[in-house]
Swiss-Prot record:
Protein name: DNA-directed RNA polymerase subunit beta'
Cofactor(s) this protein cannot do without: Mg(2+); Zn(2+)
Gene3D superfamilies for this protein: 1.10.132.30, 1.10.150.390, 1.10.1790.20, 1.10.40.90, 2.40.40.20, 2.40.50.100, RNA polymerase II, clamp domain, RNA polymerase Rpb1, domain 3
Annotated organism of origin: Streptococcus pneumoniae (strain ATCC BAA-255 / R6)
Organism taxonomic ancestry: Bacteria, Bacillati, Bacillota, Bacilli, Lactobacillales
Family named by the database record: Belongs to the RNA polymerase beta' chain family.
């Protein structure tokens, strides 16, 4: 076997007949499988031991040689070699076909490779191959045309006309083989290149296609005639097994049936040829053989598929590779692993952030080998076998050993669906009783887990390296920030929020108000003994609290509450005392009004202060973010645990209960509804009198009911009692929002009908009053739609993530600095007056390209190539700077990846990104994971405002990334200049917009109903939209430059996500958009050996031009191409990656003809062949480390080496298309 970690590239080519023979260990001549009596494989059959190897280790078929000492001997009685039975997974056989047969991939694929090579239509090919027509192979001296097609009847007539032997015409794959042998590649390529100089239209397109295929054959060394098979490889028997079931029946792989048909027909054909049977019978048999081989390679590609019992189509070699259940996705990209388990999860409120609870029985099974080794090491028993017995018996002594073994041995917990990297995190196991895994409540948000029956899987990292990586890189306590936006992902929720909210409440006039304490302990003791309430405002000597006070504050009394003293207890030293729930207090300290001189009038001072609101969920999030910024991970996770404990403790003490009486009543609800009824009546009257249209009536009625609901909501908010338990839950952010509250106490309002249209009849009742039967019926629409939408959305969002990952999986941070001379000019993103993403947010964590100066003073705020921190970004914006040139992924020059400076900080850690970080995958996850939160709907704008539907939510994101023509497309101008006139043409129901500029004039026809974005006299730039709507990016690329298109796409994606309240870092979208514009179409090859019209990577294109320019030639010209992510994934340089994504057969067909080499640079290719991935610690620069003292310069900029080139030998794994391996579980 080839050592996976030693080879650096993998090539796929067409297999020549001699190659297939060299693989084979013998010819399969009989269709038999195994003998029904002896259950031994039949000789020369599909499971023959002579050909494929022994069925038992180190034993020949007849039993003459047994044991390993005879290894390598071939038995003189039965002819079986004595070796491991594992060879039955790798030894191949072959079938000598009695007539040539075409390979269906090359004849049937789109475009047909055979058809292009021979310049024949696929229809004509099919007629010849399946014996329906003759093709002229050699016209000799007759006027017949070479390659012309004739029916049986025409053939006989021509023979009569010109005489026997005057020309050669044949049928079947044999004829095509002869034609393919005649193809002179060099000559044809030269002729096509000449033709391309003058050809236009369809002719040109066809010539480019033919040239592409012929050139592929020429450069790869594949011979066109190898597309016809004279010899068929038989894959190893253990990859198409037969298993005996209970009751003596057999279950066999479909491939055995398909091979059996081929062998039967081949043997029958041989017999007919021996007997000199009539031509028509032989022809029929040859056609059947062709169909049998077609079915074996790709059943169902042509005609009706061959079916097995119960008319189920048989799974052919192609089906073994395709789709989710195929070889690539089922067995190569994702395998089931040992040392894993799964169970229901339950909450573990007492756990630390880095711990998880593992049930004892589960742990003993998972850590069995470790426990057994330790038992032997302690001399409790002598050998491993006895240790195993001890463990299985459940001996008392094993539990203490288990405790020691699992100490500091992290385990991984994973919850499906794993939407982003936080879906798998490492924890230290803690043994618990029971059968459920215990999960820390704060990591639930990252996993999107809850405890209503969710299950999670647990995995054990085995090697020292794996344990180290789990502990250092994956420990849950390290994952404070969300990679998509750099905000904390572990904010407390529910009970924890409620407890801290209750703890920090302030109330006037509670017991003990105005007491003064010398220190924290005295205050807490007074509270515990009931002298002072948690919410009472009291005084405490400032210098007794260990906080960063100023000298002046140190000798005063601080006015606060006992709850806040306890709350500040858990905060790290060095953080200001938290008195008010706002950012000013958090960053600058307590305002002066809360300090009183020693001996001051405290009751009076308290009565002059307003009551502060308590700390809500959002405030807690801000505190965590600030602490992370100041103290980093360790301190933050410790604080989170303290905050969790405090929250749980005080929500228990608060003892909140909810009863129906806690839902308030709005006194004047009846009047508000009565008023609305009257107004609706007026609107209906206006409609009846013809004063307004039906659409206007509908909009006015729905607006009226909305207003009524809002009025009720406002009343509720105004009259709410801050101590009402429901209000507390809602206000703190623990559960529920104002909309839920107003459905409980106000009115439910308008509902959507199944078609998405809002129904005019609102639900006037609320849940406290109860709904009528009709109202209940109306509500069911919304509930059902919600469920179906969620189900559909989840599938759509998952597929989007899969496409995104596939297109960007090989984008890795490859170097420190690419030295680009370009940058990206950014400003805030806004839509009309609405701010979508501010400049400050966009600048944070990026590197500058140019110096940023103060617009008024000219003072330098930050130099070039410097990291913009949060504070610097704020300073830049406060100075009034509106646009900044930054380093961007768009302008990065690194090949197959990005450099550290163009990427900026890693949002998940808040530090500069490391070389080796798989930023492409992280970007894909960051965009895909919130996909489920986006809406599905296309908004219908009441039929009045405009006639276009604006696509929003998930469909719009897909539209952008697939570079589709948008719905409601905007008209753009190709001329920079002034709008001179807008004319309306009533006859065609259109408007004409005239733009005049220096380069010329433009006249644009826009629909009558479209809303204009420009007016007469206005200035427009090239590519500017004249009407409302989305711009088609491909059209924009034709008018403007690549950077403009990239910037436009970035802004559009941000608009969708931000409008739904989802924040995503720009850099993630930049990574994806850059992958969509990596290709160039060659327009004129110049002196390079590129082919006109081919699509190629921009780097390969520049390389080709560099070589020509150095030699003083004419460079090629090309045009950048924008591709959707699906197409971009299939156009990747790695055929393994593309084949495992979609259209497997098409990708492999194309790769084999080109003799493509996969250099294994991306992640997927390496996972497929089982090599460590070239990202993170798997990069060569980290794996080949030798510890020694090093100077920093050399460390940061190591000598450039091609990734993956460890000291290796080049191994060409000859993977023919015809040999498609399949493994069976």
């Amino acid at each position: 076997m080839v050592d996976v970690n030693r080879f650096k590239s993998m090539q796929i080519t067409l297999a020549s007949p001699s190659k297939v023979r060299s693989w084979s260990y013998g010819e399969v001549k009989k269709p038999e499988t195994i003998n029904y009596r002896t259950l031994k494989p039949e000789r020369e059959g599909l499971f023959d031991e002579v050909i494929f190897g022994p069925t038992k280790d180190w034993e020949c078929a007849c039993g003459k040689y047994k044991r390993i000492r005879y290894r390598g001997i071939v038995c003189d009685r039965c002819g079986v070699e004595v070796t491991r039975t594992k060879v039955r997974r790798e030894r191949m056989g072959h079938i000598e076909l009695k007539a040539p047969v075409s390979h269906i991939w090359y004849f049937k694929g789109i475009p047909s490779r055979m058809g292009l090579t021979l310049d024949m239509s696929p229809r004509a090919l099919e007629e010849v191959i399946y014996f329906a027509a003759y093709v002229v192979i050699d016209p000799k001296d007759t006027p017949l045309e070479h390659k012309s097609i004739m029916t049986e009847r025409e053939y006989r007539e021509r023979l009569r006309e010109y005489g026997y032997g005057s020309f050669v015409a044949k049928m079947g794959a044999e004829a095509i083989q002869d034609l393919l042998k005649q193809v002179d590649l060099e000559k044809e390529i030269a002729e096509l290149k000449e033709e391309l100089k003058t050809a236009t239209g369809q002719k040109r397109v066809k010539a480019i296609r033919r040239l592409d295929v012929l050139d592929a054959f020429y450069k790869s060394g594949n011979k066109p005639e190898w597309m016809i098979l004279n010899i068929l490889p038989v894959i190893p028997p253990d990859l198409r097994p037969m298993l005996q079931l209970d009751g003596g029946r057999f279950a066999s792989s479909d491939l055995n049936d398909l091979y059996r048909r081929v062998i039967n027909r081949n043997n029958r054909l041989a017999r007919l040829l021996e007997l000199n049977a009539p031509g028509i019978i032989v022809q029929n048999e040859k056609r059947m053989l062709q169909e049998a081989v077609d079915a074996l390679i790709d059943n169902g590609r042509r005609g009706r598929p061959i079916t097995g019992p119960g008319s189920r189509p048989l799974k052919s070699l192609s089906h073994m590779l395709k789709g989710k259940q195929g070889r690539f996705r089922q067995n190569l990209l994702g395998k089931r692993v040992d040392f894993s388990g799964r169970s229901v999860i339950a909450v573990g409120p007492t756990l630390k952030m880095y711990q998880c609870g593992v049930p004892r029985e589960m742990a003993i099974e998972l850590f069995k080998p470790f426990v057994m080794r330790e038992i032997v090491a302690r001399d409790i028993v002598q050998n491993v076998k006895a240790a195993k017995r001890l463990v299985e018996r459940g001996d008392e002594r094993i539990w203490d050993i288990l405790e020691e073994v699992i100490k500091e041995h992290p385990v991984l917990l994973n919850r499906a669906p794993t939407l982003h990297r936080l879906g798998i995190q490492a924890f230290e196991p803690v043994l618990i009783d029971g059968k459920a895994l215990r999960l820390h409540p704060l990591v639930c948000e990252a996993y999107n887990a809850d405890f209503d029956g969710d299950q999670m899987a647990i995995h054990v990292p085995l090697s020292e390296e794996a344990q180290a990586e789990a502990r250092i890189l994956m420990l849950a306590a390290e994952h404070i920030l969300n990679p998509k936006d750099g905000k904390p992902v572990v904010t407390p929720s529910q009970d924890m929020v409620l407890g801290n909210y209750y703890l920090t409440m302030e109330e006037a006039g509670r017991e003990g108000e105005g007491m003064v304490f010398k220190d924290r302990d005295e205050a807490v003791m007074a509270y515990r003994n009931g002298y002072v309430h948690l919410h009472s405002r009291v005084g405490i000597a400032t210098d007794s609290l260990n906080k960063p006070w100023t000298e002046e504050q140190r000798h005063k009394v601080l006015l606060t509450t006992v709850g806040k003293i306890l709350f500040n207890d858990i905060m790290p030293e060095g953080l200001p005392y938290l008195q008010e729930p706002n950012n000013a207090n958090l960053t600058e300290g307590v305002p002066a009004k809360y300090f009183l001189p020693l001996g001051g009038a405290i009751k009076e001072a308290i009565s002059n202060l307003e009551l502060n609101p308590p700390f809500k969920k959002k405030n807690l999030g801000n505190i965590i973010a600030e602490i992370f910024k100041r103290f980093r991970t360790t301190e933050t996770s410790a604080l989170l645990d303290r905050m969790k404990n405090l929250g749980y403790h005080h929500s228990t003490l608060a003892g909140l209960t909810v009863g129906i009486a806690d839902i308030p009543v709005v006194d004047d609800k009846a009047e508000i509804i009565e008023e609305s009824h009257k107004r609706v009546e007026q609107i209906t009257k206006q409609f009846r009198r013809g004063m307004i249209t039906d659409d206007e009536r509908y909009n006015a009625v729905t607006a009226e009911w909305r207003a009524a609901r809002e009025k009720l909501e406002k009343r509720l908010i105004a009259n709410q009692d801050p101590k009402n338990p429901i209000v507390m839950m809602m206000d703190s952010g623990a559960r529920g929002n104002i909309s839920n509250f107003s459905q409980l106490a106000g009115m439910r309002g308008l509902m959507a009908a199944p078609n998405g249209r809002i129904m005019e009849l609102p639900i006037l009742s609320n849940f406290r009053e109860g709904l009528s039967v009709l109202e209940m019926f109306f509500s069911t629409h919304g509930a059902r739609k919600g469920m179906t939408d969620t189900a559909l959305k989840t599938a759509d969002s998952g597929y989007l993530t899969r496409r995104l990952v596939d297109v960007a999986q090989d984008v890795i941070i490859r170097e420190d600095d690419c030295g680009t001379d370009r940058g990206l000019l950014i400003r805030s993103i806004a839509e009309g007056k609405e701010m979508i993403e501010s400049l400050e947010e966009r600048l944070n964590g990026r590197y500058t390209k140019k110096t940023v100066k103060h617009p008024e003073t000219g003072a330098v705020i930050i130099g070039p190539n410097e990291l913009i921190t949060e504070d610097k970004a704020r300073e830049i914006v406060n100075a009034g700077v509106e646009e900044v040139t930054i380093r961007s992924v768009f302008t990065c020059n690194t090949r197959r990846g990005v450099c550290r400076h163009c990427y900026g900080i890693n949002l998940a850690t808040g530090d500069a990104v490391e070389v080796g970080e798989a930023v492409g995958t992280i970007a894909a996850q960051s965009i895909g994971e919130p996909g489920t939160q986006l809406t599905m709907r296309t908004f219908h704008t009441g039929g009045v405002a405009s006639n276009t539907d604006i696509t929003q939510g998930l469909p719009r994101v897909q539209e952008i990334f697939e570079a589709r023509n948008p719905k409601g497309e905007a008209v753009i101008t190709e001329v920079k200049g002034q709008v001179t006139a807008i004319e309306e043409d009533a006859s065609t129901r259109t408007k004409k917009v005239f733009v005049k500029g220096e380069t010329g004039e433009g006249e644009y026809v826009v629909p009558f109903t479209a809303r204009m974005r420009v007016e007469v006299g206005g200035q427009v730039a090239r590519g500017a939209a004249l009407t409302e709507g989305s711009i088609q990016p491909k059209r924009l690329l034709a008018v403007r430059d690549v950077l403009s298109v990239e910037t436009y796409l970035l802004g559009e994606v941000q608009k969708v996500y931000r409008s739904q309240g989802v924040e995503i870092g720009d850099k993630h979208i930049e990574v994806m958009v850059r992958q969509m514009i990596r290709k160039v179409r060659v327009m004129d090859p110049g002196d390079t050996d590129l082919l006109m019209g081919t699509l190629m990577d921009i780097n390969d294109f520049t390389d080709a031009n560099k070589d020509v320019l150095i030699a003083g030639g004419v460079p090629a010209t090309g045009r950048p191409v924008l591709m959707g992510i699906t197409k971009a994934s299939l156009e990747t340089n790695s055929f393994l990656s593309a084949a495992s994504f979609q259209e497997t057969t098409r990708v492999l067909t194309d790769a084999a003809i080109r003799g493509k080499k996969d250099h294994l640079l991306g992640l997927k290719e390496n996972v497929i062949i089982g090599k460590i991935i070239p990202a993170g610690t798997g990069m060569a620069r980290y794996r080949n480390l030798e510890p020694h003292a090093v100077n920093e310069e050399e460390y940061l900029n190591p000598p450039v080496e091609e990734e993956g080139n460890e000291e290796t030998t080049e191994v060409v794994v000859d993977t023919a298309v015809e040999t498609v391996e399949e493994t069976v579980e």
